[in-house]
Amino acid sequence: MENRIYLKNETYEEYLKIKETAEGICEYINGIVCMSPSPSTGHQRISGNLYFELRNYFKGKTCEVFSAPYDIQLINGNEKNLVIPDISVICDKSGFTNNKYIGVPSLIIEILSPSNQSHDLITKLGLYEKYGVKEYWIVSPKNKSIIIYSLDNEGHYDIFENKTIDSEFISSSIFENLKINMKDIFQ
């Protein structure tokens, strides 16, 4: 699968059946099944570097870091969405099950790929804002940059940081003293 595939107007139950046999990443957002190819080598290097830095930061703290593939189910009344972020930081442990997390992570990181840019920049940005993900990082391997969106007091995203590899560090608006060297991410 080289490009993202969308199947519209599917129920959550139909999605679960599709997911059982799907190759790559299979998400369910606003009634649409989104299937993506497995990530590239460069994507995985960046993901691994970020995971390593975050894992070190959260060692001995109450929050946990998870990397894809790990299902995050977002529920609002009868509305269900299931996403598989590249990285998520979960501080509220009450939503863990054996095979997924039901609830809202504090931080989600998505790494852009040619097949998913509009999906991560538009669809997921709106979804994560709607569900109250406190911080959303969008990583661009092509531009070697990271945009950090942070929820304001009214529940809307503002850009907290927009850094390139020429910047020394990227930091978090919600986790005190979390600073990651940009060169360590894109090495």
Language model features: what each stretch is:
Residues 1-187:
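Gly/Pro/Ser/Thr-rich low-complexity, intrinsically disordered segments predominantly at protein N-termini
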